[in-house]
Curated annotation (Swiss-Prot):
Superkingdom in the source lineage: Bacteria
Known function: Involved in chromosome partition. Localize to both poles of the predivisional cell following completion of DNA replication. Binds to the DNA origin of replication.
Presence of the UniProt keyword DNA-binding in the record: yes
The entry's keywords: Chromosome partition, DNA-binding
Organism: Campylobacter jejuni subsp. jejuni serotype O:2 (strain ATCC 700819 / NCTC 11168)
Record-stated family: Belongs to the ParB family.
Name of the protein this chain belongs to: Probable chromosome-partitioning protein ParB
GO molecular function term, any single one: DNA binding
A biological process term (GO) from this entry: chromosome segregation
Amino acid sequence: MGLNKDRGLSSLISDMDTVYSKELGFDKNQSTMIEIDQISPNPFQPRKNFDQEALDELANSIKEFGLIQPIIVFKKNNKFILIAGERRLRAVKALGKKEILAFIADIDENKLRELALIENIQRENLNPIELANSYKDLMQVHKITQENLAELIHKSRTQITNTLRLLNLDIRTQELIASGKISQGHAKVLVGLDQKDEKMLVDSIIGQKLNVRDTEKIVKKIKNNESLPNQEFEDEIKKLKQILNRFGFDCKNKNNDFVIHLENIDKIKKLIKMLEKL
């Protein structure tokens, strides 16, 4: 197959559609077995995180049913560079296989970075931060606007904008989003806060397992300049709760309220004795 070279982003996307068309309904006469040791990963692969559990599931599926879709590579100096299918390649390699079914595409090496970005965007393989960086890279490389990009990859302008805004968050917050410890729903709420409030809220999301709705309520208070318990206050409340729990007291806290359940006279006397010893 000969893909056209030295064209714009729209042509690259068209080329990837051609590759996927070939991949999903490929002619077995045009696919071939390639030694895995001869394949190098795409150096411009935007995807950095690979879920091990998902890879194990894929490996088990390939072991039982075989590799249904070949990977896509291009040839360089008698070796091959991966274009699409890194998860499949990793899974097959984990099974101890020496070869893998591949489709050899005729693609300009200079377009490898863009193809890797587009491949992952179209397959939705990226976490929110990787996706945001991919959008940013494509816009910079091809000098296009958010509106141009939205039209080319068939996404809404709002979706592009909201995703790119994640790159304004603190690096630590971005890492937590990329690792899945903070959801994209949480991330959207955090955008626009100053660094101090962002850090405080991120710590609360992780420490108190706040859902998105709880997070939205806190952000609303911050933006309305309402007082919020600081992290030190929350930490001390948590310690107090742990101490009381150890002595058999049922207690809970919500916002600035701390409630101790004293269901009988014995519990009241026990608490009084504890306080008198202080």
